Amino acid sequence: MSKRCAITGKGPMVGNNVSHANNRTKRRFMPNLRTVRVMLEDGTTRKIRVAASTLRTMKKQSH
């Protein structure tokens, strides 16, 4: 399973862990993915993985 949002395509970003001594090691920032059920146009439901920020936008636009 890929770590990518099914709607926006948001995926992992690359950055650094930075210690107090300013030593840097590579790390990945993962998107906050949630599995949700969505209703498709034909009336069927399907589980997709979307980012939490996408869920907030979907909730805002549905009202």
From Swiss-Prot:
Disulfide bonds: none annotated. Pfam families: Ribosomal_L28 (PF00830). One of its GO terms (molecular function) is structural constituent of ribosome. Keywords: Ribonucleoprotein, Ribosomal protein. GO terms for cellular component: ribonucleoprotein complex; ribosome. The keyword rRNA processing does not apply. This is Large ribosomal subunit protein bL28. PANTHER family: 50S RIBOSOMAL PROTEIN L28, LARGE RIBOSOMAL SUBUNIT PROTEIN BL28A. Belongs to the bacterial ribosomal protein bL28 family. InterPro entries: Bacterial_rp_bL28 (IPR050096), Ribosomal_bL28 (IPR026569), Ribosomal_bL28/bL31-like_sf (IPR034704), Ribosomal_bL28_bact-type (IPR001383), Ribosomal_bL28_sf (IPR037147). Gene3D superfamilies: 2.20.150.30, Ribosomal protein L28/L24. Residues 1-20 are annotated as: Disordered. GO terms for biological process: translation.
